[in-house]
Amino acid sequence: MLDRRVEPRMLCADLVDVQWKDQSGRTRRGVANLEDISLSGACLQVDRPVPQGTTLRMSYPNGELLGVVKYCVFREIGYFLGVEFEPGNRWSQRHFRPQHLLDPRRLVGRVTQRLKTDVPPLVN
């Protein structure tokens, strides 16, 4: 799947409440595992499909973000939703810091530094 995000994606793991209306107009609720997040979107793992184009509310302690489901794919352990936050809804670590949060750019930087210091020079 093509990654169209402009902002950096933060890997994370936390449970959030989700709410949406199904095709008959009934409100559905569930708990989702927040897989990653950026300023303008998130990836959520849920136990049932949510159709593309559905407006979804993601609630966390002290706040919520509204977005639209851009994709829903099944992968071995559940359904993964790509959610694009609606205008005026942007994620910020000041408002919500997931329980486990990792910036993969920092990890790559650390590995690169370690490789530079751990690799012996080549000898001809």
Where are these regions (language model features)?
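Structured alpha-helical
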Residues: M1-N124
